[in-house]
C-alpha cells in the first residue's frame, strides 16, 4: 500500500494507509468461480471539501513563474522562482495539483517531455473528483498532454488522449496539426515500423505506458529493472525483465498497458515492435 500523492501532515497519510489495510474487495468471478486476475485499487481520502485554494505565498510564486515563461525571462530567473516554489512545499491539495502543472511547464522548458507528461498527467487526474480547473483550462491542459505524449514517443497514450480531445479541437485553428500527427501515427501502425522511447523509473518504483504495437523490448538499461506487468483487456501477466529480449503479446490479450518495476532513477530504452 503506497500513498502516491498527499498534502498535509504525515499522520493523515498513516491513518489513510491503516484504513486501506482494513478494506476488502470481492475478486472477479467467471461462471460463479473466483478467477485469477491482477487487481489495483486507488482510494482517495479527504477530511472535507471545504478547503480549496492555496496560500497567498504559493499563488504569488505560481503567477510569477508563468509570467516569467510568458515574457521570456532568463533561465536563471526561472530557476530561482521554480526553486522558491518547490521549497515552499504544499499544504493543500490544490497546491499539489498546481505544483504538478508548474513542474510540467518547467520540464517542458528544459526539453524533458517525459517528465512534463508525467507531471501534467498527475495534475489532470484530480479533475474528476475535485474540479480544480475550469473546463477551458482543463481542455487546454489535455491538449498539452497530447503533445508531450507525442514528443516523448508515448504513442499509445497519445492515441488514448486523442480519443478524448478530438471533439474539442475540431474547431481549433490548430486542428490540421493534430490531424497530421494522428495520421502519421496510424501510418506507422499500418507500415509496421518499430519505434523507441526513453523510459525512467520514478520515485514510486514504476514506469508505465499504453502499448500500441504487439511486442516490446528493453535496451540501454542504466540501473535495475525487476519485472514487467501487462494489464490487458483479456489478460494479465507478470514476468522478470531480460534486456535485449523481444516479448511478443498474444493476439487475444488486446489493448495492453505495460508497467515496469525497478529502482528509482533507472533509465532504459523501450522499443515497440510489430
Task: List the model feature ranges, each with a label.
Residues 1-29, 244, 253-254:
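A short, well-structured alpha-helical segment
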Residues 2, 35-38, 107:
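A short coil-to-beta-strand element that immediately follows conserved catalytic motifs
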Residues 4-12, 50-57, 70-73, 111, ...:
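Extracytoplasmic/periplasmic, Sec-exported soluble proteins
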Residues 17-53:
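Short, positively biased Gly/Pro-containing turn/loop motifs at secondary-structure boundaries
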Residues 62-193:
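Alpha-helical protein-protein interaction scaffolds
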Residues 49-60, 190-194:
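Low-complexity, Pro/Ser/Thr- and charge-rich linker/hinge segments at domain boundaries
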Residues 167-274:
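Eukaryotic alpha-helical solenoid repeat scaffolds
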Residues 2, 59-63:
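Acidic/histidine-rich, surface-exposed loop or edge segments in extracytoplasmic proteins
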